Amino acid sequence: MDTKLLIALSLICAMACVAQGYGAPGKTMSVQGESLVLAKTEPGNLCFDQVTKGSLTLRSTYVAGKKGSVVYTEGVDYVVDYAKGTITRTANSRIPDYSTNCLYGQKDFDHTKFPSFSNHAWFVWADYQTTNGRSWAKPHDQSKYLADIRKKLEAGGPFKIASYGDSITAGGEASETGFRFQYRYAAYLQAKFPKAKISVQDVSISGYSSQQGIDWFDKYIGTVDKPDLALVGFGMNDHNIGGPDPEKFKNNLVTLVKMIRERKGAEVILFSAFPPNDNWHYGSHRMAQFAEATREAAAEAHCAYADVYSTWEMVLQRKDQSSLLGNNINHPDDFGHWMYEQAFEAMKF
């Protein structure tokens, strides 16, 4: 990826969380590109309450100013409760009514029985300032695992990141390549270590699990030439009904870390997944166990861990799941990919 583009993307990442005393509770913080779906005249929660009056804008595209983007009008298309941090459609709003989505209100749904289950046509995107902001992810020290990675980045020169996982890592529901979490993280690292020339190669296996990650190793990540760092994230498909139990999943991840180190000579970061739609029929709805298994695998394999699950759970304390899911099942939208990247930034090394 071009260095200038990486730096530009890093600025996009940074714009979404600019704080006085980054992430501290109760601090003023700007949020950009937060996604919502709004039904009828029911209020939808933002990530934070105590929104600064007059700071909120709402549009139809993730990127402000994109051709064809509609900027909605407060008081005409929506109303804001600034203290509570909610947005509500008006009765005659131009904002798409999410109650017309085929999965709205469905319980235990089988997505194969519905003609279209995407949320993209219903998303709106908010920019605002809150005076009650906090960190998206808890910082944690991973320097004992990533010290050599830091040395390589500081030294400069080519630095290759390989990403290996399921359809989320393959970019599921991100609208542009640069908005996928691994490219956002590469942009963050590029800005932090300007001497490095960072590239990303994704070799993910959409629709499959950690077992296929092992079985098809040579066909996928085995083809990457001299990666320095591998971002490895399975779990969304493992977690489905009929998948392996968390212990087997953990062992698979430990095996993958060992294979990557021995065969490719790369350091590894394992990252957890988030809970899919609670109303989806095919989920086992025990993602907390798979997230914990990922953390345990990282500890056992002595590699770094990015805690995506906890970041997602923090956001879900206020927001509904559909407002974060591009396919309304298990793929994050652009804002969700940004949340993933925040979990990576929280690793300090």
Enumerate the predicted regions with their spans:
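Bacterial N-terminal signal peptides that target proteins for export
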Residues: 1-8
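Bacterial N-terminal signal peptides
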Residues: 8-16
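Extended beta-strand solenoid/passenger and fiber regions
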Residues: 21-84, 88-96, 102, 109-134
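Serine-esterase "nucleophile elbow" of acetyl-processing enzymes
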Residues: 130-204, 216-230
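Solvent-exposed loop/turn segments at secondary-structure junctions
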Residues: 167-171, 205-211, 236-241, 274-278, ...
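Catalytic-core regions of hydrolytic enzymes
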Residues: 205-229, 239-254
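A short helix->loop->beta-strand "cap" motif at the edges of active sites that frequently abuts
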Residues: 263-267
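Catalytic His-Asp segment of secreted/periplasmic serine-dependent ester chemistry enzymes
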Residues: 273-349
